[in-house]
Amino acid sequence: MNHCQLPVVIDNGSGMIKAGVAGCREPQFIYPNIIGRAKGQSRAAQGGLELCVGDQAQDWRSSLFISYPVERGLITSWEDMEIMWKHIYDYNLKLKPCDGPVLITEPALNPLANRQQITEMFFEHLGVPAFYMSIQAVLALFAAGFTTGLVLNSGAGVTQSVPIFEGYCLPHGVQQLDLAGLDLTNYLMVLMKNHGIMLLSASDRKIVEDIKESFCYVAMNYEEEMAKKPDCLEKVYQLPDGKVIQLHDQLFSCPEALFSPCHMNLEAPGIDKICFSSIMKCDTGLRNSFFSNIILAGGSTSFPGLDKRLVKDIAKVAPANTAVQVIAPPERKISVWMGGSILASLSAFQDMWITAAEFKEVGPNIVHQRCF
């Protein structure tokens, strides 16, 4: 299939959107998947934009109404999502959608209606000549060099454990936890507030995210870590105004919520339990392959110590003499996009694209027949 330009790959996350041209090692553009609209006429009167996206919306968020087109992994505002996709083509990539195919990512268990609407929008609204949709966890697995394994994918909006056999997601084994990076940032704000550190405004959020990403870690044993003297745990952080704050048990209490969601008053199993549950829902002959190939993906799996703690907690409940291995690829923040870049570049993949002619003939239902 010949086109004027290389395929575009878009990883549509709840927190960040990643976009670039297939064949590249990294996405050319990564920014917040948010849209800001002016409050009243103040910015418009000053010559500012009435609508802005990504980093620009983030920088102005205190004076804007902020909306998230994707929540908990699913598109909730189709109008805003279309604005975002058009922005990627027009202002970031500076490409015409009609000149080449696009590969878009989706979470496991994406509702059928959502899949159809995404397909429809790319063909009818953006006018792409060819399209494909691929599950995020499958792409992360490809990027790690595997075709079979259990992917624990935790980004900004949702955490999923997804068993994959020979490149195909096993939907009956997928488990989901509605707790991820955005929730952990909110939780860290609360933990710091409880220690008298008030970083609660919209503009403070970026600071709290930086603290989370720079200093938070997962304890091998939460109770033992809590028993340590505060001096042994202390980290200092300098705020933009020069003030220095001291941080202690908040740094491991925050990501502990991934293992014990009850800390955030959420009645749900933690990541160790959803991984175990996913594996046990699969055929007995596949379980050892999954226990020994647990692949981490997404920014919220990047906390130091998370991989070792996951091995420890899963090994406790796994059948006797079962090898448990967790693989933590260093590039896991972008591994979903990387997998899409690899897949869309393969010569063997070129016959997989849904063409505009096929869409016209079959309709949006074609996505269920071709993308799974």
From Swiss-Prot:
The keyword Nucleotide-binding does not apply. It is found in: Cytoplasm, Cytoskeleton; Cytoplasm; Nucleus. InterPro entries: Actin, Actin/actin-like_CS, ATPase_NBD. Ubiquitously expressed. Gene3D superfamilies: 3.30.420.40, Actin, Chain A, domain 4 (3.90.640.10). SUPFAM superfamilies: Actin-like ATPase domain. Its main location: cytoplasm. PROSITE patterns: ACTINS_ACT_LIKE. Keywords: Cytoplasm, Cytoskeleton, Nucleus. Pfam families: Actin (PF00022). GO terms for cellular component: actin cytoskeleton; cytoplasm; male germ cell nucleus. Belongs to the actin family. Interacts with PFN3. This is Actin-related protein T3. It comes from Homo sapiens.
